[in-house]
Amino acid sequence: MPAALLVSKSPPLCGELTVHGAKNSVLPILAATLLCRTPCVLHNCPDILDVTHTLQILRHLGCSCERSGSTLSIDPRGFAENAVPPALAGSMRASSLFLGALLARTGAAALTLPGGCPIGARPIDYHLQAFRALGASAEEEGGTVRCRADRLHGARLRLPGPSVGATENAMLAALGADGCTTIENAACEPEIADLGAFLCACGADLRGAGTPTIEIEGGKALHGATYTILPDRIETATYLCACAACGGALTLRRAAPASCAGVIEALGQCGCRIRCGYDTIAIHRQGPLTACRPVTARPYPGFPTDAMPVLLAAQLGAQGKTSFTETIFENRFLYVQELRKLGAKLSQDGRTVRLQGAEPLHAARLRAGDLRGGAALVLGAMQAEGESTIFGVKHIQRGYDNLEAALQSAGARLKTVEIPIKV
């Protein structure tokens, strides 16, 4: 029987929520543990499907993986493989990060092109160009990527675009190369900086992670380390937008306010009062919500593409008009047609969606087709009269550590059920 979320209109939210570790940080760090010769201990690891799938890959490669609460212990000393099975690789996009780690560790890697959210093309070409610059052969044929190098060498390489995945793969591969590697036009996301900090804790000679230029002195053996994953800025944005949508007051603990500046600014424009501490964010929305200024998703430090769906959903009840433009993933707006089923007045022109807010919303049967779009449907249904049913909850579980329980604790009315019918 398929699982579904039943979501009713929410009262104003109230309480405290703790932000989990960042999905987009823990996944590359888990891949990076393959480069260590001794065990690693990672704190603040979210319990999400993508982490579960990554641990399955590590175990297949010979690593020992144990979880205790939010702490993962990874022992790579049993490492014995250099290929990821298609069934595991196809479960998520982040499996591509094992290419760089395996290439650095063994000089060879094979991987079926990975799956993930169907939000647009995320070509592997940038990754392969980086591997070739380091002296590897790297080809994709029939849906399988194969990389090989007798010996990797340092190089100055410039990425065609600031791709997060390509930056991470280039960093990992460069650690196995002799000499210095300079990565130009690198992605600057906080998760890149977190990966760099973890690698430095393991003994890597690396500078500039989180800036457009990263320098790596490769060829050094890495040891294990104990490390704490940074807070998830997209989960943070989701909670903030939920409060903006439903009203009330929330305090978020273990947050990273600086990484959420774009979302905080947009919600401040809407009439929300937000106060930030060192690792806390308090949001209060009592009066009516007003439309924010038009938002365009851009690479960090621009507005995060992953936060746009939940901000758009929060704006459904806002008074006025606004627009949302996507510049990164061409199919990001798959969820828009589902929000229309709730009565939302949305029009799409290419990569821009225009919203006329404050339209009456009613319950509907919805289907999540991707992770962040699924979260947007939850926030939309929390504003609609009646009880909505959301299918495809596995997409939400890929990246949120029990979103249902967190929102329930703040007063939201939602629950997971098994639906005994085919939909």
Describe each model-derived feature in a short phrase.
Residues M1-V423:
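Short, structured segments at the rim of ligand-binding sites
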